[in-house]
């Protein structure tokens, strides 16, 4: 009995680099080198950037393996950062963070209490005074999360009891997305006094352009926070299970059924691409909530839109400049990032990936509609195209 088991183990391959595996480490079969790399990355809060397109070859025969892609591969195959025992911080923490699951952040800065019902991040007032917009966004986001608990509460559910996340169908995803439009627009007005003072038509242009990418980007960010990249998290806390798209599209309320083969051909590549280009890089960067707010600010105040006025362009430029200055202060004084410019560039580089991912999904839906391959509701098309 012992002999065959030993023999089988010899031939197991590391899920990351294809070297001979040493055993099951942090949720995946891995060699000693990849397990040590993952442990060092998580425990030391290391961040990496890829010089390519986040798709480098990380097999053992590569001489200078891309560390960013190696870490992404670790996450892809199931390695869980929460499984790495964290070092105790050397001094009293400056920032208290509580979230659904612990993320990988600087241990000398952040502490992780028991998970509460929503994501909250607090910094001392001496720092928040230097980050007025970002701190206001954090406070209003907490209000948004609490409002969502009420809005998306199931009939008869206790508002004080945490929702147990479960997979949703596309009909429920539409319902949650459309319900969240008004809440999100209110959140934007709470965050930015300048937005509140814009004319109605300028508000509509900015918000309609930003909502769908934001909806997808937030889902990817919350997936990163939960360490479940295969789950695109919805506003309610429920999620789209990208490993079971058949149940997502072929729900009992569907207007028309579609085969698993067609789902894999039409929709799976777009979902996989979004995870690989957005969610996994967020996990690799260990993106935090303030950095997410910066991404949303840049997404909302898109001064390249041809429909917006010169005044709106001027206001948007001013807001983005201020927020980037606050991010620089945050990185230098709170997170203690050694190279804040490099990290900022890597974070901002996520925006094109978000936009491309959303456009790819929109294109797929348009193809299914034009060629009558799948009949989704008008609400679904409108939500994904920003027409609401």
Curated annotation (Swiss-Prot):
Annotated compartments: Nucleus
Gene3D superfamilies reported for this sequence: Erythroid Transcription Factor GATA-1, subunit A (3.30.50.10), Retinoid X Receptor (1.10.565.10)
Taxonomy, superkingdom: Eukaryota
UniProt GO molecular function: DNA-binding transcription factor activity; RNA polymerase II cis-regulatory region sequence-specific DNA binding; zinc ion binding
DNA-binding stretch(es), residue numbering of this chain: 11-86
SMART domains linked: HOLI (SM00430), ZnF_C4 (SM00399)
UniProt cross-references to InterPro entries, sorted A to Z: HNF4-like_DBD, NHR-like_dom_sf, Nucl_hrmn_rcpt_lig-bd, Znf_hrmn_rcpt, Znf_NHR/GATA
Record-annotated NR LBD domain positions: 115-387
Name the UniProt record assigns to this protein: Nuclear hormone receptor family member nhr-16
């Amino acid at each position: 009995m012992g002999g065959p088991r030993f023999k089988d183990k010899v031939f197991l391959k590391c899920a990351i680099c294809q070297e001979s595996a040493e055993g099951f480490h942090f949720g995946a079969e891995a060699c000693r080198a990849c397990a040590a790399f993952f442990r060092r990355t998580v425990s030391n809060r290391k961040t990496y950037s890829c010089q390519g397109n986040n798709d480098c070859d990380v097999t053992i025969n590569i001489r200078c393996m891309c560390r960013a892609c190696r870490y992404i591969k670790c996450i892809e195959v199931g390695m869980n950062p929460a499984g790495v025992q964290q070092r105790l911080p050397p001094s009293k923490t400056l920032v208290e963070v509580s979230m659904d699951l612990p993320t990988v952040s600087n241990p000398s800065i952040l502490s992780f209490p028991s998970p509460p019902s929503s994501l909250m991040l607090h910094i001392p007032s001496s720092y928040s005074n230097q980050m007025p917009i970002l701190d206001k966004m954090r406070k209003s986001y907490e209000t948004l999360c609490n409002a969502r608990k009420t809005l998306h509460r199931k009939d008869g559910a206790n508002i004080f009891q945490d929702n147990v996340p479960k997979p949703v169908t596309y009909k429920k995803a539409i319902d949650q997305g459309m319900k969240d439009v008004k809440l999100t627009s209110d959140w934007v007005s709470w965050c930015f006094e300048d937005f509140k003072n814009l004319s109605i038509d300028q508000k509509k242009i900015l918000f309609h352009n930003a909502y769908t990418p934001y909806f997808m980007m937030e889902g990817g960010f919350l997936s990163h926070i939960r360490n479940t990249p295969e789950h695109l998290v919805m506003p309610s806390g429920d999620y789209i299970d990208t490993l079971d798209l058949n149940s997502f599209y072929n729900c009992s309320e569907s207007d028309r059924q579609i085969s698993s083969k067609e789902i894999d051909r039409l929709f799976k590549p777009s979902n996989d691409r979004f995870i690989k280009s957005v969610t996994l890089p967020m996990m690799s960067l260990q993106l935090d909530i303030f950095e997410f707010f910066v991404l949303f600010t840049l997404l909302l105040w898109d001064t390249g839109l041809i429909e917006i006025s010169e005044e709106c362009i001027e206001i948007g430029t001013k807001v983005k400049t201020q927020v980037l200055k606050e991010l620089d202060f945050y990185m230098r004084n709170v997170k203690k990032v050694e190279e804040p410019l490099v990290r900022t560039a890597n974070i901002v580089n996520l925006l094109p990936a978000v936009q491309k991912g959303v456009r790819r999904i929109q294109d797929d839906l348009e193809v299914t509609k034009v060629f009558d391959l799948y009949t989704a509701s008008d609400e679904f098309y409108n939500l994904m195209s920003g027409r609401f």
